[in-house]
Design a protein with these regions (language model features):
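Extended, alpha-helix-rich binding/interface surfaces that flank or overlap catalytic cores
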Residues: 94
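Membrane-anchoring alpha-helices and their flanking helix-loop junctions
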Residues: 1-86, 98-170
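Solvent-exposed interhelical
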Residues: 89
C-alpha cells in the first residue's frame, strides 16, 4: 500500500474506530453535559483536559507511524507491511489503545461523569482481549521473530522508561 492510500485509509479508520469509541459513545452516554461539581474538582478537570489532549496527540502520532513507517493502516482489513516499532512504539506496544482510554478518562474527569469511568473499564477489557486473542497472534504470524523480540523487550500496557532500540539500530 502506498503512503497516500495508507493516509486516506488511516483517516477513515480514525473517524470510525477511535472517533466512535472515544467521541461518539461518550457523547451518547453523557450528551457531553458536565455535572455541577464542587470547587475542589477543578484540578481533576484540568487533569482531564491534559489526558484528553495527550490522548489525541498520541493517537495522531500513532496513526502517522502506521502510515509512514508501516505503510498501512491500524485497521485489521488494511494492515501495515512493516512492523511499526518507532516513535512511541519504542516505549509501549499499545499507545493507540492507551490514548483512547486516556481520552475517555479525560472526558470523565472534565464532565464529572462516573458512567464514563465504567465505560473506560469496559473498553479497556475489550482492548486487552482483542490484543491477546487477535492482534498478538496475528503480528507473531506476520512478522515472526522480529515481533517476538519486540514483544519481549517492550511492555504492552505500561511504558518503558527508556526507548527500545532493536538490534542493529544505531
Amino acid at each position: 500500500m502506498d503512503r497516500v492510500r495508507a493516509a486516506v485509509g488511516s483517516a477513515v479508520f480514525f473517524a470510525l474506530a477511535p472517533g466512535v469509541v472515544a467521541g461518539v459513545v461518550p457523547w451518547w452516554l453523557t450528551g457531553w453535559r458536565a455535572r455541577a461539581l464542587p470547587a475542589w474538582w477543578l484540578p481533576l478537570r484540568v487533569a482531564g483536559v491534559v489526558l484528553l489532549v495527550a490522548g489525541a496527540g498520541v493517537l495522531v502520532h500513532a496513526f502517522a507511524r502506521f502510515v509512514a513507517e508501516g505503510l498501512g493502516t491500524p485497521a485489521p482489513v488494511a494492515p501495515t507491511r512493516e512492523l511499526v516499532v518507532g516513535g512511541l512504539y519504542r516505549y509501549v506496544r499499545n499507545p493507540m489503545y492507551l490514548a483512547v482510554l486516556a481520552a475517555i478518562v479525560g472526558q470523565a474527569l472534565i464532565l464529572g461523569r462516573l458512567v464514563l469511568l465504567a465505560y473506560a473499564a469496559v473498553v479497556a477489557a475489550a482492548f486487552v482481549a482483542f490484543v491477546h486473542w487477535y492482534e498478538e497472534p496475528t503480528l507473531a504470524e506476520q512478522f515472526g521473530a522480529r515481533y517476538q523480540a519486540y514483544r519481549r523487550a517492550v511492555p504492552g500496557w505500561w511504558p518503558r522508561r527508556h526507548p527500545w532500540r532493536p538490534a542493529g539500530d544505531g
